[in-house]
């Protein structure tokens, strides 16, 4: 999100969000590859890339020389196993807030073996000062029990870090819903005021600018209130650092997790959250050299009460902690169920992705088995004794996210300078087994069951 460019934008009042109708499946939303777009005078669309291999990485959103760049991977998996991969598409050539940015997506119904063409999820109008100028930095989750999917993203023409982006002229937030497993989508609905308003009375002062950490929104395995299992999302916010919010109605309304008067990571940048085995929540936030970790300890799951620990822990300062050498970059945290091969014991396994470095290069994955409650009792416990890392990319590479596919593999979705140093990132998909990531120490329970049949 962050950039060093300078610009100014107009002041607008808040939008009232009404009911949204589901957009029809419009064939005109199919991307036209290999042709110049009349609206783009300097950049061309990237060509479609064949995706016939079922076990190797695939460039889902490729950026070649002199073409409109892609960035910011997000991915979800539906209960039926459909993968939904989302990416920024940037006719303006820069981050969301600087001009027109669209969201595009592709679907796979065979565990990433083949993919649909690109479709438009949300298209910016490119009009300076417009609240619909661009849509970017998507965070996504598919409901574990239905066909519903929700995307939360930035909308408009403000830049997160600019002084002109304030509570009165905020970095705006939109939600987009699907009720058919990501095939069709509602029009974006703005929820800016309902999110910022949560923190207006904070002792840290009102939040001046925020956005949802891109990639994967977390859905609880344990806490169900009414129709849905609880959602968790983490906010990059200024001033005061990260905040965490939760939703019990699948992204329609949100609430602060913990007090609004403190931040779980005052120095945190782009953040993610994951649910721990006991139902508590761990924050993993972008930090130079590694990650900031903090843990929210529940008093009441149903009421959403509890507290964050007083201090976030820097992973690189802990014994055998996660390290991102000479970089500060968005990554993903994911907990899956696994079997330890040496003992045959089932246990949760935490995965954390970062560029291994030096710099934004060599994206990889650390892992940690949660052998007992003590391994995640506190943020310090959680940040200690990681293994790996497994190196995914040998090139310049940056943001990454992941989910577990129905076949047990990890759908790893990451940015890489695939087609040449100095080009903008291509968003790459690579399916990985837990055996690959852990050097044969762990196997996915899903994959193990299939082999035993």
Where are each of the predicted segments found?
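Bacterial Sec-dependent N-terminal signal peptides
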Residues: 1-21
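Asp-box/BNR beta-propeller blade signature and adjacent active/binding-site loops
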Residues: 21-453
């Amino acid at each position: 999100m962050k950039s060093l460019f300078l610009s100014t934008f107009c002041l607008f009042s808040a939008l009232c969000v009404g009911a949204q109708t589901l957009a029809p499946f419009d064939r005109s939303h199919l991307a036209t590859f290999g042709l110049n777009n009349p609206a783009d005078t300097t950049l061309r669309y990237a060509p479609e890339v064949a995706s016939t291999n079922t076990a190797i990485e695939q460039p889902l959103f490729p950026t070649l020389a002199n073409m409109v760049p892609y960035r910011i991977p997000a991915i979800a998996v539906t209960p039926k196993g459909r993968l939904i991969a989302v990416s920024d598409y940037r006719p303006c050539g820069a981050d969301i807030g600087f001009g027109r940015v669209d969201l595009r997506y592709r679907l796979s119904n065979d565990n990433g073996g083949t993919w649909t063409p690109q479709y438009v999820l949300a298209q910016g109008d490119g009009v300076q000062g417009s609240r619909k100028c661009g849509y970017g930095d998507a965070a996504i989750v598919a409901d574990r029990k239905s066909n519903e999917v929700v995307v939360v993203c930035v909308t408009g023409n403000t830049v997160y870090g600019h002084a002109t982006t304030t509570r009165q002229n905020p970095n705006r937030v939109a939600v987009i819903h699907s009720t058919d497993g990501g095939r069709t989508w509602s029009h974006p609905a703005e929820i800016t005021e309902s999110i910022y308003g949560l923190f207006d009375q904070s002792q840290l002062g009102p939040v001046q600018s925020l956005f949802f950490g891109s990639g994967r929104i977390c859905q609880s395995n344990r806490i169900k209130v009414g129709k849905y299992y609880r959602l968790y999302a983490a906010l990059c916010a200024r001033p005061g650092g990260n905040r965490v919010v939760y939703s019990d109605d699948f992204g329609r309304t949100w609430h602060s997790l913990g007090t609004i008067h403190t931040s779980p990571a005052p120095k945190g940048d782009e953040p993610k959250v994951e649910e721990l085995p006991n139902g508590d929540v761990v924050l993993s936030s972008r930090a130079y050299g590694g990650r900031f970790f903090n843990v929210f300890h529940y008093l009441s799951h149903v009421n959403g009460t509890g507290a964050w620990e007083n201090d976030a822990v820097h992973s690189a300062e802990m014994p055998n902690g996660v390290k991102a050498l000479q970089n500060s970059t968005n990554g993903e945290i994911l907990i899956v169920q696994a079997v330890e091969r040496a003992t045959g014991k089932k246990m949760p396994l935490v995965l954390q992705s970062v560029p291994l470095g030096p710099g934004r290069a060599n994206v990889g994955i650390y892992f940690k088995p949660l052998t007992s409650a003590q391994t995640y009792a506190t943020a310090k416990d959680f940040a200690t004794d990681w293994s790996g890392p497994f190196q995914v990319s040998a090139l310049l590479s940056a943001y990454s996210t992941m989910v577990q596919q129905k076949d047990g593999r990890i759908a790893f979705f990451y940015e890489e300078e695939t087609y040449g140093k100095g080009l903008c990132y291509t968003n790459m998909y690579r399916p990985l087994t837990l055996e690959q990531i852990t050097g044969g120490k762990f196997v996915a329970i899903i994959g193990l069951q299939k082999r035993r049949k």
